[in-house]
């Protein structure tokens, strides 16, 4: 065991490949003992590692004059040390109210946005923060007590991608006690945030009542928690890659704000991959800003939702995310306003894009397309009256079906195809100038349609349809 604080941090930094030589580092300094210990450690290594150091401080304006005095303290210290200091005052309470989030999440968003800006300004490779071994223990315990994702249970990462570089935490290998001793040896007078002692916060209660007992059992227990954290992160990285690969085979449709998946294909995955697959979808749709009110309880409810025997149903998630099951498909999408009836003329040849993003392209040709799939409609040009009209469905709509006698209700076509009710109102119907329905894209062609086998040399009207939804890969 190393005797000195600096040697212990050196070993930890080397073991986890935390810091490269000849780098610019933005150091988050609150003025408290943790961040001061981090700053002075980096200053001690500055010449040896050829480091450029920039200090960044955020006044969240939670504590009025007291927090402003913290800012002035950091500014004065940096002036004495001759290092660059970037500070900002942010009314986090106002930001919190504006975006409807809790104070801690709001403060974190504001703080990280500022750190990213300073990192970019100085072309820094790293942002360094002062989290230590006790913080790691508290974080893991708190997430185990409250519930979290597998990634969350792994605790605080030593090093992770951030902006164009990395966010690093070199002090995770040392305890709070060791940090305080280091500050005392350097005769530092750190600022103390009184909120760190308020027992209304779970973390503070764990710090006061739980950690002392754990340290009695094993004074080096923070090292065990850190080892657990690293192993969990390594396992999680592998499982995430596997889940990503599997989910891209399960997803049937994808757009910016919606994802649909095949329930049977999803349920064929192992439970660990199902949980991570759901997390991938949520990260994609929420754009990695998952509401703090969303927890593992929601994931459990969703998995149970998939197992239900009822063919339809829905769940509401935080942030207006709605999950709708329809037969063997489940869609994740943000709540939308009721779709208004629509109707647009389509010239031949011509192109239109509907308000929902669906696109129709028409052409006239003596040859029919080689790819006659469900997105293409072909009819003899002279059999159709023009202009065409693209509209939403109407009560009582019927059409003649290619290869069948009589007519069939559009409603029945939707039901047979298991089209979810909420999608039927925006599903386009193609009519000719007389109002006769000639095509329901992706579902049924009318008796006017020409198949590839029937085609002879003639003048044809061809419609190509492209839905706003696409099958595709989810982003990591």
UniProtKB/Swiss-Prot annotation:
CDD domains: TilS_N (cd01992). It is an enzyme of class 6 (ligase). InterPro entries: Lysidine-tRNA-synth_C (IPR012796), Rossmann-like_a/b/a_fold (IPR014729), TilS/TtcA_N (IPR011063), tRNA_Ile_lys_synt (IPR012094), tRNA_Ile_lys_synt_N (IPR012795), tRNA_Ile_lys_synt_subst-bd (IPR015262). GO terms for molecular function: ATP binding; tRNA(Ile)-lysidine synthase activity. Coiled coil: none annotated. Its main location: cytoplasm. SUPFAM superfamilies: Adenine nucleotide alpha hydrolases-like, MesJ substrate recognition domain-like, PheT/TilS domain. The keyword ATP-binding applies. ATP binds at residues 30-35. GO terms for biological process: tRNA modification. Disulfide bonds: none annotated. It catalyses: cytidine(34) in tRNA(Ile2) + L-lysine + ATP = lysidine(34) in tRNA(Ile2) + AMP + diphosphate + H(+). It comes from the Bacteria. It is found in: Cytoplasm. Keywords: ATP-binding, Cytoplasm, Ligase, Nucleotide-binding, tRNA processing. The keyword rRNA-binding does not apply. One of its GO terms (cellular component) is cytoplasm. Ligates lysine onto the cytidine present at position 34 of the AUA codon-specific tRNA(Ile) that contains the anticodon CAU, in an ATP-dependent manner. Cytidine is converted to lysidine, thus changing the amino acid specificity of the tRNA from methionine to isoleucine. HAMAP family: tRNA_Ile_lys_synt. This is tRNA(Ile)-lysidine synthase. It comes from Bacillus cereus (strain ATCC 14579 / DSM 31 / CCUG 7414 / JCM 2152 / NBRC 15305 / NCIMB 9373 / NCTC 2599 / NRRL B-3711).
